[in-house]
């Protein structure tokens, strides 16, 4: 497992420690982490502060995103996939998509390379959270 997905997992665990949903993200440029984020919907009472959005906000204005790669512990949803496409991010690496299939086809149809690592650690993190917080998870995915 590479350092970048490990950093995203660390962000997910930080979110869980804060009482939130354990999804983390990092943005990579020139083989360096330039931003980190995690889902803060619960912490900030903000329905759009998903991990990927938090990460992009933390990156600030970097100009061109075409040379970046976004890592997320879970396949990005349509909200986050829209941001990926809007900013021209060319590659997304997801820890898993079993828990939530996300918007892979949408991103790929817009020229984004999508890699699903199918990591047990990411699946377990989500599975344990959902078992303990089904209502919160259903709220997060719009059910």
Question: What positions do the PLM features span?
Answer:
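Short, basic/aromatic recognition patches
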Residues: 1-18
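Secretory/periplasmic and organellar redox-cofactor proteins
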Residues: 9, 124-143
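Short secondary-structure junction motifs
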Residues: 18-22, 65-67
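Short beta-strand scaffold segments in enzyme catalytic cores
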Residues: 23-31
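Zn2+-dependent cytidine deaminase-like catalytic core
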Residues: 35-128
